[in-house]
């Protein structure tokens, strides 16, 4: 990067957003109000649900959305943008509306996570960053939540910064992991920026720096008696590491009356070593000593450890969490669903594809979630046209939009709107929750899902249904487009 060049994140956009914006202005569309939905088509890892995340960083981006003179000069140098468009960018500010599901909300395919209502150029320029931040953080939050659930109440620490795909991925990934249930992160700057608790004790290098393993452990216990978690696999876990840890605990912590301490296993047969370690620690009287394990873990390996009767109190999970290694793409898209005509009427738009899963759901919409009043559990999600309301005092028949003969009557339920206002006329109206509040909300909302939806393999298919009015509009647009092309 040029040393005199400042980084303006507004320029983190796909070039076609600028060429389209230039074209919109030339065509007279710059003031035309458009509606875009951000949604995904399938849950990573074949899961039953995803976790929404990344909204806070999208807000940060919009709050600083502007084009510097160096940006205008660069674009002018490309030689394809008219001066009127460059003037437009030089005076750019966001003036639209945004709605979104709160971070930490369980979400499902084909329902809008973010809705943008704004003039055409403004809405188009948001596309790349909206997708970047929602895709990345939702991906990591979804993976982290799977791992946390596999841990069955034991602590999960995010350890992946060094394996993340770039610094931003490490920082924001740690945030997303914390929202989804991790107890903390090894990423110090994420704690500094977001308040995700920074955790960590020692690496093998600490042990290697001392003449003996015991000296390394004893010194660490002296310096950090309230946080003595010793890495015991540098040389020989059972014959050296654990015995030396026990000796250090006896010599340093016991005289201080400290009973809480820990060891960490980072290699070898984790299940076997954890069982042996637990036995050795208990026999030595250190029953409150915790056993933390790491080493390329994910939800499936953690499940396997439980099947092998592993004795584990906490997990440090790195590369397979921070990169979502098993399926590292979330797949959110940003699609035009409506425009306003010159009289302010909302005109629904649809994109058709040979791939049925890529056909969009048109119109400016509301998203409801139905909860059973007796159980508190989520029953289904329900998309309506923006001007519809749901009367949850009456029974309602819902149907699968892809198989309309599959119908169900919902009764004794509560309907809650999921999309909340974030921006109104360019002004931030959303009260941004703190990270602890988001984390708590995420836990509460995941608890509203039935266990069948939370299965790792072959989860129950949670339905996102359409109102009859919305379904009819979509069908009418499909038929209209098909008839037009058949005539040609």
Pin down the residues of each PLM region:
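Short coil/turn segments at secondary-structure boundaries
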Residues: 73-74, 142-146, 160, 454-461
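Gly/Ser/Thr/Ala-enriched C-terminal appendages of enzymes
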Residues: 2-32, 36, 45-47, 282-284, ...
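Hydrophobic residues within beta-strands of alpha/beta enzymes
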Residues: 199, 263, 291, 313-315
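Buried, small/hydrophobic-residue-enriched core segments of structured protein domains
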Residues: 2-33, 42-44, 80-81, 86-95, ...
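Short acidic, Pro/Gly- and aromatic-enriched capping/linker segments at domain boundaries
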Residues: 98-104, 413-418
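N-terminal, Lys/Arg-enriched amphipathic/low-complexity engagement segments
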Residues: 34-90
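An N-terminal, globular interaction/scaffold subdomain
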Residues: 60-64, 100-103, 107
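Residue-level "edge-of-site" marker
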Residues: 204, 294, 318
